[in-house]
Swiss-Prot record:
The keyword Transit peptide does not apply. Pfam families: Tyr_Deacylase (PF02580). GO terms for molecular function: D-tyrosyl-tRNA(Tyr) deacylase activity; Gly-tRNA(Ala) deacylase activity; Ser(Gly)-tRNA(Ala) hydrolase activity; tRNA binding. Its EC number is 3.1.1.96. It comes from Roseiflexus castenholzii (strain DSM 13941 / HLO8). An aminoacyl-tRNA editing enzyme that deacylates mischarged D-aminoacyl-tRNAs. Also deacylates mischarged glycyl-tRNA(Ala), protecting cells against glycine mischarging by AlaRS. Acts via tRNA-based rather than protein-based catalysis; rejects L-amino acids rather than detecting D-amino acids in the active site. By recycling D-aminoacyl-tRNA to D-amino acids and free tRNA molecules, this enzyme counteracts the toxicity associated with the formation of D-aminoacyl-tRNA entities in vivo and helps enforce protein L-homochirality. It catalyses: glycyl-tRNA(Ala) + H2O = tRNA(Ala) + glycine + H(+); a D-aminoacyl-tRNA + H2O = a tRNA + a D-alpha-amino acid + H(+). GO terms for biological process: D-amino acid catabolic process. One of its GO terms (cellular component) is cytoplasm. Coiled coil: none annotated. InterPro entries: Daa-tRNA_deacyls_DTD, DTD-like_sf. This is D-aminoacyl-tRNA deacylase. A Gly-cisPro motif from one monomer fits into the active site of the other monomer to allow specific chiral rejection of L-amino acids.
Length: 157
């Protein structure tokens, strides 16, 4: 599972000319589900997203999390995070989970954020969406659940 996390002062998602999700200060989370991803990974990434200290404290240091600031999250599914561009000019998306697997995992991710006490807005799975945001910083972080399976220290490999 992959998440592109952007710190925002506001963000919204529109489908068919209608805003279906909007947040103020918080995180826009573009979430891709890969083949083999599980609900455990959805919960792990949600917890990591909620607790990442990427908001400034009173001294301007990254010491506060989304939970600490009482921020919101806008979760938008994005299978294109699994684009394979190694061959040719047209990306392959064969590493992305099929919709019947991905949709419940995106929902599990959003539900876990809500369980942690975060107000969550969401896109519409499978729809053509327009996403608007005001980047704050900018701060953009990439999370990949595959990395959490690897040893943290190079010497542990």
């Amino acid at each position: 599972m992959r998440a592109v996390i952007q710190r925002v002062s506001e963000a919204s998602v529109t489908v068919d000319g209608r805003v279906i999700g909007a947040i103020g200060r918080g995180l826009l989370i573009l979430l891709g589900v890969g083949v083999g991803d599980t609900e455990a990974e959805a919960k792990l990434l949600a917890e990591k997203s909620a607790n990442l200290r990427i908001f400034a404290d009173d001294e301007g240091r990254f010491n506060r999390s989304l939970l600490d600031i009482g921020g919101e999250a806008l979760v938008v599914s994005q299978f294109t995070l699994y684009a394979d561009t190694r061959r040719g000019r047209r990306p392959s998306f064969s590493d992305a989970a099929p919709p019947e697997i991905a949709a419940p995992l995106v929902e599990a991710f959003a539900n876990e954020l809500q369980r942690l006490g975060i107000a969550v807005g969401a896109g519409q799975f499978g729809a053509m969406m327009q996403v608007a945001l005001v980047n704050d910083g900018p701060v953009t972080i990439l999370l990949d659940s595959a990395i959490f399976r690897e040893p943290r220290n190079r010497h542990e490999r």
